[in-house]
Every structure is written in structure tokens, then in C-alpha cells.
């Protein structure tokens, strides 16, 4: 127990408040017991007290919540200290804090009163009306494709709310609404993942959503809808465009998430977000938004080799599992991948532990199996850096997970579901099989090549054809290198004992006929050639051709 001295110098013990107001209980803040308390005065909350209920028996340890760590006093104290530092840095919050001390009833709101000399009036460009692009029947059809393909993995929308918004939007077709960017993005993704020829207005829907979202980055009011729409735009760009475009969109998403305060649980929200926070946000929806945005930004940044957006004062808890979607499985996989952050100085044992955790995941959606496989291949690349001697057991497990991803990619291609890893996993898996360069790994090259060719037939884009030609040339390079090694061995046997020339010739012929060598390629290599596999292991294959309007569609 800590000791303090009063004005007379006598030592006194710190007294815990005998009661706490309902606001401090809800927000898990320390209450001084006054009515109104200091915390409620500071943040202009209504301060109310209720009589103490009768004491109940203590709950058993087995009934502790999964989020016990987030609710621990140490965690709450750490978050509280972080927020105090942020508020102390903020010049926009200080006038409010000063006003609360001088006159709690008339304190100014948190606002950038002297941020600059005043904003310029910017002309508002008229947006294309959604109802002029597609009919209600088309919107409902595209939304059904979205809910079938995208929603199970990235469940950031409530299906019932989406259907209600569609009905309301076409009930008043002339009036634009803040939900329009979501509807445009849902329609565009539904067109992309429909499995059919794209809707003729898909490009216009993407452009309309982009124009509306660009205004959210400079608007005074940011809503939950804007963060949701930015997530949907990131998914669309990750599926169709270059790495830079999807990375920029994912970073913008994270900044919108911070603006609405979605990275902090409602009971722990900081004063600095009071001018932009969306107070109407449902707790569970907010948590799903934050975690899905974090997954997208982190994984895109890792794969692209860029910095991710790291928010301060994060207190948002993971969402709860929900029937009909696998978003919590996605988040669990992301939490494992945090080990692979470039700033983490992982030992070999850490990476092997991460691989074991990836293996233990039981996933039922093919898009998640692709991500699981990609995570395993990433761990292999990190293992190559951490150690030059990877055990055969680890290599076998990597190959098994890579093959699972390959099979999932083929199934998704047959289902006409253009998830981005449908192209990337086969290409990366083939590169890693050649880099491992064991009899077991090389035995998978043939089936993997056949699968990649099948995927290329399903999605006949120049990008995929180029990727296929590249990996085939790498296989030929590996084949030629082994043939040259075989020639050296044959020649060495002939030079050692001329009398065994005939026998050596027979042996070399048997090797040449072996199925694992394949046909002789038309590429020649210098004697001292040694291929740098890291160049190809770090290469990402975009699903569509990079383009200004979202890339070339499959045919």
C-alpha cells in the first residue's frame, strides 16, 4: 500500500473510493467518488451513482473471460497513460482541458480553433448517382454475389442492414446518401466475383466510390460508413490492381479507422478523437472494422515490402465468432503472422513455433487456406535467412501446406473466384520447390506446373501467361544446371578409370532417362552459374494486369 503525507506532515494511507459512478464503471476508469466525479467533469459525461448491490460469491477461475488480459489493471493503466500522453501532445484538446478547469459548464469543445487562418471554400464536384448506373434488381443480384463470396471472409457488413439500405436507396433514388460508397463498392465486388462476365458498369461503380471516398479524407465529419467503404475499396484493388494502389488504399483505411476512434474500445476512447469519433458505432461492428483493416494493411505491407500503419493507444478487443463468417479465423491467422514483422528479431525456434501454430489452424474456406499456405511459404523464406540448415521435417511440413494452398487455388479457379492468391500461391510454391531442391520437393514440380497451367486456362490474362512462362523458364534453368552437374560426374568417372567407360556410359544413360529430369531446355548456362532464388521468392504475382482502371479482366 502506498503512503502519502498530508499538509501537517503526517503519514496517511491512500484511500480507495468507496463508490464509483456508472460512467467510470462502464469505461473502466478510476473514479474519485465525488458527485460529479473529476473524470465526468473533464469529459462532459453525465455522472450518476447507483446503490451497491449485495456482494456475490467470487466467480471461479475457470469462468474468466478470454479477454482477461485486456481487462487487467496493468493493461488499463498502460492504455490510460498512453492516452494522457497523447492528450498532452494535442494542442486542439488543451483549450477544452483548460476550460474544464476554469468553467466546467462552459468549456469549449475539442476543435482546431487556431489550426490555420481559415479553410478555403472548395467546390463540390457532383457525384454520379448510383441509381443512374444500375437498377435495384441489378444491385440486389450483385449484392448476393458479394455476400456469397466476400462476406464469409471479410464480414464487415451486416447482411440485413445491407438489404435494408438497398431498399431505402431505391425508394428515394434522387437523394444521395452517406451509404452510397458502400453500395457502389459492394456492387463492384459482386461483379468481380460473380463468376460471369463483368457488369458493364463495374468501372463506373469503382470510379464513383473512389470520388466519394476521396472527399472523406478532407471532410469535417467521418462516419463508420466511410471506414467500411475504404475496406471494400482495398479488397477490390488488392484483387485487381498493382501493389502500390492497394497499399495506399489500406493506409488510408487505417487513418479513417483512427479518425472515428475505432481502434479504441468505447469505454477507453480518448478525448483527442471527440471531434471526429462516430458515437453511433456498434461495438462489435467497430471491432470487426478495426481488425479487418489491420489485417489488410499489415499483410499488404509485408508482401509489398512497405511500412504498415501503426496506431497508438490501441485497446480494441478482437471480435466474437459469428455464425456464417470466418472473420475470426482470419484474425487468428493474422495474430500468428505478427511474429513475421520485419522489426521482430526472430530466432529459429520462434519461426518453427509460428509454423506449428499455422499448422494447427483448422480452416474450411479456400480463401483462408490460401492465406494459410502463403503464411507458411513466408515462414520458409524467413527460415532461409535465419539458418542455412533447415531440417527435413520442417521442409516436409512447408511442402504439405504449400500443396494444400495449391489445391485450394485450383478449386477457387474452377469456381471463378478471383482471390489474389489464386495466382500467387502456385507461382511462389513452385519457386520454393525449386529452391528446396530435394527429391521430395522436385517430385511436386510436375503436378504444381499442371495446376498452374489449368489456372491460366481459367483466367487467360497476359500477366498469368507471363508468370507461367517465367516459372517454366526457371524449371528449365534448374534442369540444365542438374544436367551439367551430371555431365561433370560422368566425366569424372570416365577420367578415373578408362576401362569403365562403357559401364559409365550405361549409368549416365539411365540417369538421362530418369523422369525427374524432364526434357532438355533450350537455355545455356555458364559453368559457374548459381541462381539467386531470393529474387523470385520475394516476387509477388498480381492476379490481373496492372492498370489505371483496375487491371485487365479474365477472359
UniProtKB/Swiss-Prot annotation:
Phenotype upon gene inactivation: Impairs the production of kojic acid.
GO molecular function, one term: DNA-binding transcription factor activity, RNA polymerase II-specific
Keyword tags: DNA-binding, Metal-binding, Nucleus, Transcription, Transcription regulation, Zinc
Region Disordered, residue ranges: 51-73
InterPro entries: Metabolite_Synth_Reg (IPR052478), Transcription_factor_dom_fun (IPR007219), Zn2-C6_fun-type_DNA-bd_sf (IPR036864), Zn2Cys6_DnaBD (IPR001138)
PROSITE patterns associated with the record: ZN2_CY6_FUNGAL_1, ZN2_CY6_FUNGAL_2
GO biological process, one term: DNA-templated transcription
Coiled coil residues, start to end: none
Location of the protein in the cell: Nucleus
Organism superkingdom: Eukaryota
Biotechnology: Kojic acid can be used for several biotechnological applications, including use as an antibiotic, as an additive to prevent browning of food materials, and as an antioxidant. Kojic acid is also interesting as an inhibitor of tyrosinase. Finally, kojic acid has also been shown to have strong nematicidal activity.
This protein's GO CC annotations: nucleus
DNA-binding positions: 21-47
Record function comment: Transcription factor that regulates the gene cluster that mediates the biosynthesis of 5-hydroxy-2-hydroxymethyl-1,4-pyrone, also know as kojic acid, a by-product in the fermentation process of malting rice that acts as a chelation agent. Mediates the expression of kojA and kojT via binding of an 11-nucleotide palindromic sequence, 5'-CGRCTWAGYCG-3' (R=A/G, W=A/T, Y=C/T) within the target gene promoters.
Stated name of the protein: Transcription factor kojR
Organism from which the protein derives: Aspergillus flavus (strain ATCC 200026 / FGSC A1120 / IAM 13836 / NRRL 3357 / JCM 12722 / SRRC 167)
Amino acid at each position: 500500500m502506498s503512503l502519502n503525507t498530508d499538509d501537517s506532515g503526517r503519514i496517511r494511507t491512500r484511500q480507495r473510493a468507496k463508490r464509483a459512478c456508472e460512467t467510470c464503471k462502464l469505461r473502466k476508469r478510476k473514479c474519485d467518488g465525488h458527485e460529479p466525479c473529476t473524470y465526468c467533469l473533464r469529459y462532459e459525461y453525465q455522472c450518476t451513482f447507483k446503490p451497491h448491490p449485495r456482494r456475490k460469491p467470487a466467480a471461479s477461475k475457470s469462468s474468466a473471460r478470454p479477454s482477461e488480459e485486456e481487462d487487467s489493471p496493468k493493461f488499463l493503466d498502460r492504455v490510460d497513460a498512453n492516452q494522457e500522453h497523447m492528450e498532452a501532445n494535442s494542442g486542439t484538446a488543451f483549450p477544452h482541458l483548460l476550460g474544464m478547469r476554469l468553467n466546467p459548464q462552459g468549456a469549449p469543445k475539442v476543435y482546431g480553433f487556431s489550426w490555420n487562418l481559415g479553410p478555403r471554400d472548395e467546390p463540390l464536384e457532383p457525384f454520379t448517382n448510383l441509381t443512374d448506373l444500375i437498377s435495384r434488381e441489378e444491385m440486389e443480384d450483385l449484392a448476393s454475389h458479394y455476400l456469397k463470396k466476400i462476406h464469409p471472409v471479410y464480414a464487415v457488413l451486416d447482411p440485413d442492414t445491407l438489404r435494408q439500405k438497398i431498399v431505402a436507396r431505391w425508394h428515394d433514388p434522387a437523394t444521395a446518401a452517406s451509404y452510397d460508397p458502400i453500395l457502389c463498392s459492394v456492387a463492384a465486388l459482386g461483379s468481380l466475383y460473380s463468376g460471369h462476365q463483368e457488369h458493364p458498369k463495374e468501372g463506373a461503380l469503382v470510379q464513383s466510390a473512389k470520388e466519394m471516398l476521396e472527399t472523406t479524407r478532407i471532410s469535417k465529419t467521418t462516419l463508420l460508413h466511410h471506414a467500411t467503404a475504404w475496406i471494400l475499396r482495398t479488397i477490390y484493388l488488392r484483387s485487381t490492381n498493382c501493389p502500390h494502389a492497394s497499399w495506399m488504399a489500406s493506409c488510408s483505411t487505417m487513418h479513417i479507422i483512427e479518425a472515428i476512434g475505432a481502434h479504441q474500445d468505447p469505454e477507453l476512447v480518448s478525448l483527442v478523437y471527440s471531434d471526429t469519433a462516430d458515437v453511433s458505432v456498434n461495438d462489435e461492428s467497430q471491432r470487426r472494422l478495426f481488425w479487418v483493416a489491420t489485417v489488410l494493411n499489415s499483410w499488404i505491407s509485408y508482401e509489398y515490402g512497405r511500412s504498415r500503419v501503426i496506431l497508438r493507444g490501441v485497446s480494441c478487443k478482437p471480435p466474437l465468432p459469428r455464425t456464417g463468417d470466418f472473420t475470426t479465423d482470419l484474425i487468428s491467422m493474422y495474430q500468428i503472422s505478427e511474429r513475421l514483422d520485419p522489426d521482430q528479431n526472430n530466432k529459429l525456434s520462434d519461426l518453427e513455433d509460428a509454423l506449428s501454430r499455422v499448422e494447427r489452424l483448422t480452416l474450411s474456406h479456400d480463401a483462408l487456406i490460401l492465406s494459410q499456405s502463403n503464411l507458411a511459404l513466408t515462414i520458409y523464406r524467413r527460415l532461409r535467412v535465419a539458418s542455412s540448415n533447415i531440417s527435413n521435417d520442417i521442409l516436409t511440413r512447408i511442402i504439405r501446406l504449400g500443396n494444400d494452398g495449391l489445391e485450394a487455388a485450383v478449386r477457387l479457379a474452377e469456381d471463378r473466384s478471383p482471390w489474389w492468391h489464386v495466382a500467387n500461391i502456385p507461382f511462389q510454391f513452385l519457386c520454393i520447390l525449386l529452391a528446396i531442391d530435394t527429391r521430395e520437393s522436385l517430385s511436386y514440380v510436375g503436378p504444381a506446373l499442371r495446376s498452374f497451367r489449368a489456372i491460366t486456362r481459367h483466367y487467360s490474362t497476359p500477366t498469368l501467361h507471363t508468370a507461367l512462362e517465367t516459372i517454366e523458364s526457371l524449371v528449365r534453368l534448374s534442369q540444365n544446371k542438374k544436367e551439367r552437374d551430371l555431365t561433370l560426374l560422368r566425366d569424372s568417372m570416365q577420367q578415373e578409370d578408362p576401362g569403365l567407360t562403357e559401364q559409365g556410359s550405361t549409368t549416365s544413360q539411365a540417369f538421362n532417362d530418369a523422369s525427374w529430369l524432364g526434357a532438355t531446355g533450350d537455355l545455356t548456362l555458364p559453368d559457374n552459374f548459381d541462381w539467386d532464388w531470393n529474387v523470385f521468392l520475394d516476387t509477388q504475382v498480381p492476379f490481373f494486369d496492372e492498370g489505371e482502371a483496375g487491371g485487365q479482366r479474365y477472359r
